[in-house]
C-alpha cells in the first residue's frame, strides 16, 4: 500500500491531543518589548523574525514536507498582541468545555500569566474596545453583534498569490520591494510609511529564509541516524528547503514545499482564519505535468505527497474563546482548496490534477482542507461524476460554488472579467480573486434577523436584555395591519445595519493600526506597488460582506404573522406577543405554537407566500448595507464597498441561545436556521422545492455567499440511477435557478444518534457543520443536535 505511511501519519496526528502552546506568545512578547519604539510595521516584522528564528521545529518520521506552526502538531499557539484576556479567564476551563476542548499544562499556565502584565491594555482587544463609540456600547455589552472573534483575532479570508510565489520565489517580491523603495521621494510625506513598510518586507523575507534553512540543518541531522530510504528522503527535504520558498519552484515537490511553508507561516504571523490555498489545481498543474512527463513523479507519488500536504494542513490549530466557539464550532480553520471552474479565458479548467486532488482528499478523509469545486455549465461530466463519488463517502466534501452566478455578480461589483473568472473559495462559501483581494472580506457582526424582528415588534427594545436597540416605531400589540409591521421592520433593520457598520469600522481601524500583517501583504497584489499593507488598502480589490443569521426563521415568522394574525384573525397581536413572552407556556401557549408551526406557509417549499416575504424583508438589508463603504474605500482598491452574505457558520446555534421565542413557533434559546437553509423539518416537499425557494433570494446581490446545507441518507445515493438524479438536480439548480452554492451531509440520522451515544465507535465521523466540515465528536452537544435535526431528503 503506497499510502500506508501517510495513513499512519494521519492516525498519529488524529490521536494527538491538542494543547495550548505558549511558545509563540513568549517570543512575541520579547520582540514587542525589544522593538516597542519602532513603527508598527517594523515591530510586527521583527516579531515574526523572532518567532521563526527561535520556535521549536521538527520533521515527523512519515512526512515528506517540512514546516510546523506550533511546538507540536495540533497545538494552538497564543497571539497576545490580539488578545490574552479570554485565555487568562479560561486557563482552567479549556479542558472542561462541552466542545472544542484544549489541554494545558501548569507550566504553560505560568508562562502565560508571566507575560500578562505586558499586554494589559496593550493589544488589539483593548485598543479596539477603547475605539468603539459610546453609541454602540449597548450592542457590544449584550453581545447583539457577534464581534467576539473579530476583536480577538485577525480574519484573513483570502488566498495569497501562490502562482507568483512559485514562479518568482520570495526573492521576486523582495526585489520588487527594493525597486519600489529606491524610487521613493522621501520629501513626500506619504513616502515615510512606505519606506518602513518596504523595510518590514525585507525583514520577514529574511526571517522566512532562516526558518527554511533551519529545516535544512534539521533534515541533515536526522539523516545521520535514519534508514537508507529515509536518509535519501531527508536529504531531498534538505535540498528543497535550501531553495524554496526564496527561489522559484521547478518541481512538484518544491512547489508543494514552497506553498506549505507560506501557508504555515501566514498562520504563525496572524491568527486569522480562512487562509486558503486558492485555485490549487491551476497553479500546481504545470509542475505536475512536467514531472509526470519526465518520469520524476507518478500519479501515485503525487497523490501521496498531496495526502501528506492535507495531513499537514490539519496540524494547524486555533483556540477561540468559549463565546467564539458558539459561532465556529469544531476548531475550524476554513483553509479552502478550490478546483475546477473555468480558466481566465473562459475554458473548462478541469485538468488531471483536479482528479488527483479529489482522490487525495478522499484518501485522507479529513475535515481540512475545505474542498470546493467550481461548477459551470460546461463542467466535464466525468469530473462531476467523480465529485459525487467522493461526496458519497460522507465527510461533507466537496462543496459546489456556481460560476454562472458568482462571476457575473463579481463583474457587477467592479471586478475585471478575467479576474472574476479566476475566483476561488476563501473560507466557507465566500469567494475572492486569489492574490488580489483585501484582508477582511467578511464582516463579523452577524445580523440576527429573528432578533431584529423581535426588537421591531417590541418597539425598538431588545426583549432579552430590556435595553433599547432602536428608535420607537410602535409596539406590535398596537399594530392594526401587516404594513405597519413591515414599515417598522424597514426602519429598525436600517438603524441596526448602520450600528453594525460603526462597530465593524471601529474594529477594522484597530486592525489596521495595531496588527499589520507584513508577509501576507507582500504576497498580495498590489501592496508592494502601493507601498501599503492590506489593511491600509494595498490590495487590488477590497470588499466586506455582512453576515445574516436566521433567514428561514424570519420568513416563517413573517408568513405566520401575516396569515394568522392579519389575514385570518385566528390570533390577535396581543395573544401572539404574550405567547412569545412566555415561550409558549400558559393557557394557550402550546396551541398557538402548533398553529404557527403547522398552519402557516414555510420557506423551503417553493411557496411564494413565504418566499416573497423574506425576499422583500431581505432586500431592505441589501439596499442599506450597500450604502456604507469600508475603511479602505478611496485608498486604492477597486470596490471598498459592502454586500451581504449568508455564511453564518455555526453562529445559528450561538445566536439562538440569546434569542427568545420567535413567531415561527421556535422556542427560546434553541438554534436558528443556518445559512439560507430552511428551518429543520419545515421543508416538506422535497429537495427541488428547497432549491426553488432559495433561488428566490436576491442571489445576485448576496455576493458574500449563499450557503445551502442539505442532508441525504446514504441509501438515497446507493444506486447509479440515484447519483444521476442528484447530478441532474444540481445542474438544474445551478444552470436554471442560478443557485450560488450547495453542500451535502451524506449521513443517516441513526448514525449521528449512535455517534452521540457511542463516540468511541465513530471517531472518524465527519459532518458538514455549515460552510465547513468537522469531526462530529469534537462538536458541542447543541451543535450535534442541530445537525441531527436537519431535514433528511430523498431524491
Tell what function each PLM region has:
Residues 181, 209, 216, 220-223, ...:
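Heptad-repeat amphipathic alpha-helical coiled-coil interaction surface used
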Residues 199-211:
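Extended non-globular scaffold/tether segments
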Residues 213, 217-220, 559, 792:
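Short amphipathic alpha-helical segments enriched in leucine
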Residues 4-198, 229-236, 244-795:
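Conserved catalytic cores of very large enzyme subunits
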Amino acid at each position: 500500500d503506497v499510502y500506508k505511511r501517510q495513513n499512519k501519519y494521519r492516525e498519529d496526528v488524529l490521536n494527538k491531543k491538542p494543547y495550548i502552546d505558549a511558545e509563540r506568545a513568549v517570543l512575541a512578547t520579547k520582540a514587542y518589548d525589544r522593538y516597542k519604539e519602532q513603527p508598527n510595521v517594523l515591530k510586527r516584522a521583527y516579531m515574526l523574525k523572532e518567532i521563526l528564528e527561535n520556535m521549536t521545529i521538527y520533521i515527523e518520521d512519515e512526512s515528506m514536507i517540512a514546516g510546523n506552526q506550533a511546538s507540536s502538531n495540533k497545538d494552538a499557539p497564543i497571539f497576545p498582541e490580539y488578545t490574552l484576556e479570554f485565555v487568562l479567564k479560561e486557563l482552567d476551563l479549556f479542558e472542561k468545555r462541552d466542545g472544542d476542548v484544549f489541554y494545558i499544562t501548569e507550566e504553560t499556565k505560568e508562562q502565560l500569566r508571566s507575560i500578562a502584565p505586558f499586554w494589559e491594555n496593550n493589544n488589539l482587544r483593548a485598543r479596539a474596545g477603547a475605539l468603539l463609540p459610546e453609541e454602540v456600547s449597548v450592542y457590544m455589552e449584550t453581545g447583539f453583534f457577534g464581534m467576539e472573534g473579530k476583536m480577538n483575532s485577525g480574519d484573513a479570508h483570502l488566498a495569497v498569490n501562490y502562482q507568483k510565489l512559485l514562479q518568482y520565489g520570495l526573492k521576486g517580491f523582495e526585489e520588487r520591494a527594493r525597486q519600489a523603495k529606491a524610487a521613493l521621494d522621501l520629501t513626500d510625506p506619504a513616502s515615510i510609511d512606505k519606506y518602513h513598510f518596504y523595510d518590514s518586507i525585507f525583514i520577514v523575507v529574511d526571517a522566512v529564509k532562516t526558518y527554511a534553512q533551519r529545516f535544512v540543518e534539521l533534515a541533515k541531522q536526522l539523516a545521520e541516524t535514519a534508514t537508507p530510504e529515509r536518509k535519501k528522503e531527508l536529504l531531498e527535504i534538505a535540498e528543497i528547503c535550501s531553495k524554496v520558498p526564496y527561489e522559484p519552484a521547478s518541481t512538484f515537490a518544491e512547489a508543494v514545499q514552497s506553498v506549505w511553508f507560506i501557508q504555515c507561516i501566514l498562520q504563525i504571523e496572524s491568527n486569522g482564519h480562512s487562509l486558503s490555498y486558492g485555485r490549487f489545481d491551476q497553479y500546481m498543474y504545470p509542475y505536475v505535468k512536467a514531472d509526470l512527463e519526465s518520469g520524476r513523479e507518478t500519479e501515485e507519488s503525487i497523490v501521496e505527497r498531496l495526502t501528506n500536504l492535507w495531513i499537514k494542513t490539519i496540524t494547524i490549530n486555533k483556540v477561540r474563546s468559549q463565546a467564539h466557539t458558539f459561532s465556529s464550532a469544531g476548531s475550524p480553520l476554513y483553509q479552502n482548496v478550490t478546483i475546477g471552474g473555468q480558466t481566465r479565458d473562459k475554458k473548462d479548467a478541469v485538468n488531471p490534477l483536479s482528479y488527483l486532488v479529489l482522490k487525495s482528499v478522499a484518501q485522507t478523509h479529513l475535515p481540512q482542507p475545505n474542498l470546493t469545486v467550481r461548477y459551470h455549465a460546461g463542467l466535464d461530466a466525468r469530473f462531476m461524476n467523480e465529485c459525487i463519488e467522493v461526496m458519497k463517502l460522507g465527510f461533507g466534501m466537496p462543496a459546489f460554488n456556481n460560476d454562472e452566478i458568482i462571476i457575473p455578480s463579481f463583474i457587477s461589483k467592479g471586478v475585471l472579467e478575467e479576474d472574476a473568472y479566476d475566483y476561488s473559495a476563501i473560507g466557507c462559501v465566500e469567494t475572492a480573486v486569489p492574490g488580489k483581494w483585501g484582508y477582511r472580506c467578511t464582516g463579523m457582526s452577524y445580523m440576527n434577523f429573528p432578533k431584529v424582528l423581535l426588537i421591531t415588534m417590541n418597539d425598538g427594545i431588545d426583549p432579552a436584555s430590556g435595553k433599547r436597540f432602536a428608535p420607537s416605531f410602535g409596539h406590535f400589540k398596537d399594530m392594526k395591519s401587516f404594513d405597519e409591521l413591515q414599515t417598522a421592520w424597514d426602519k429598525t433593520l436600517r438603524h441596526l445595519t448602520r450600528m453594525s457598520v460603526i462597530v465593524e469600522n471601529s474594529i477594522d481601524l484597530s486592525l489596521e493600526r495595531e496588527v499589520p500583517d507584513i508577509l501576507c501583504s507582500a504576497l498580495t497584489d498590489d501592496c508592494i506597488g502601493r507601498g501599503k499593507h492590506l489593511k491600509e488598502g494595498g490590495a487590488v480589490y477590497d470588499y466586506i460582506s455582512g453576515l445574516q443569521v436566521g433567514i428561514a426563521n424570519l420568513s416563517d415568522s413573517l408568513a405566520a404573522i401575516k396569515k394568522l394574525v392579519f389575514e385570518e384573525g385566528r390570533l390577535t397581536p396581543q395573544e401572539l406577543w404574550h405567547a412569545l413572552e412566555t415561550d409558549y407556556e400558559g393557557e394557550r401557549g402550546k396551541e398557538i405554537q402548533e398553529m404557527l408551526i403547522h398552519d402557516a406557509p414555510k420557506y423551503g417549499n417553493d411557496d411564494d407566500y413565504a418566499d416573497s416575504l423574506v425576499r422583500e424583508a431581505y432586500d431592505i438589508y441589501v439596499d442599506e448595507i450597500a450604502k456604507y463603504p469600508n475603511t479602505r474605500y478611496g485608498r486604492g482598491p477597486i470596490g471598498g464597498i459592502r454586500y451581504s452574505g449568508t455564511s453564518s457558520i455555526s453562529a445559528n446555534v450561538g445566536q439562538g441561545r440569546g434569542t427568545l421565542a420567535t413567531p415561527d413557533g421556535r422556542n427560546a434559546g434553541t438554534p436558528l436556521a443556518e445559512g439560507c437553509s430552511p428551518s429543520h423539518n419545515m421543508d416538506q416537499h422535497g429537495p427541488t422545492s428547497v432549491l426553488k425557494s432559495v433561488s428566490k433570494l436576491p442571489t445576485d446581490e448576496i455576493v458574500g455567499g449563499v450557503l445551502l446545507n442539505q442532508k441525504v441518507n446514504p441509501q438515497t445515493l446507493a444506486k447509479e440511477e440515484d447519483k444521476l438524479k442528484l447530478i441532474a438536480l444540481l445542474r438544474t439548480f445551478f444552470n436554471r435557478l442560478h443557485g450560488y452554492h450547495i453542500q451535502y451531509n451524506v449521513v443517516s440520522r441513526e448514525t449521528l444518534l449512535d455517534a452521540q451515544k457511542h463516540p468511541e465507535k465513530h471517531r472518524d465521523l465527519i459532518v458538514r457543520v455549515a460552510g465547513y466540515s468537522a469531526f462530529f465528536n469534537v462538536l458541542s452537544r447543541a451543535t450535534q443536535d442541530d445537525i441531527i435535526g436537519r431535514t433528511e431528503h430523498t431524491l
